[in-house]
């Protein structure tokens, strides 16, 4: 599991939480996929590159630990545009936990 906090000028401005589903715990994603469970940046710090840097760090951690594909669900208004810019593609799967569309990306 990965929990990281982004700090700017000694203040937390965002965080991320992810894991690699090694055993297929979720039941609808194949084992070995990385899962971004939570990702947040305070509104006033958005569109300044912090989220992109945070995502790059998480992607590197996933890659280092052997994941080849990552997935997430995204808020259609605030999250989807960002994740599509990061290279995520909509799948035909729906997360049964939150009824949101699952997006996937090969890890660079």
Protein language model regions, located:
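Active-site beta-strand termini and strand-to-loop segments that position acidic
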Residues: 7-9, 105-107
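Residue-level detector of high-confidence beta-strand sites
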Residues: 15, 91-93
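Conserved acetyl-CoA-binding loop-helix of GNAT-fold acetyltransferases
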Residues: 41, 47-60, 85
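Conserved beta-strand in the GNAT
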Residues: 5, 11-20, 35, 40
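Short acidic/polar active-site loop segments enriched in Thr and Asp
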Residues: 68, 89
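Conserved beta-strand-loop-alpha-helix junction that forms the acyl-donor binding cleft
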Residues: 71-84, 96-99
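A conserved beta-turn-beta hairpin within the catalytic core of GNAT-like acetyltransferases
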Residues: 21-36, 46, 97
């Amino acid at each position: 599991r990965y929990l990281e906090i982004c700090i700017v000028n000694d203040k937390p401005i965002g965080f991320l939480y992810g894991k690699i589903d090694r055993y297929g715990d979720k039941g609808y994603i194949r084992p070995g996929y990385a899962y971004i469970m939570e990702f947040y940046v305070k509104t006033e710090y958005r569109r300044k590159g912090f989220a992109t840097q945070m995502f790059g760090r998480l992607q590197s951690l996933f890659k280092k630990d052997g994941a080849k594909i990552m997935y997430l669900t995204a808020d259609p208004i605030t999250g989807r545009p960002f994740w599509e810019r990061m290279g995520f593609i909509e799948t035909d799967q729906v997360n049964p936990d939150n009824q949101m569309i699952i997006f996937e990306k090969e890890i660079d």
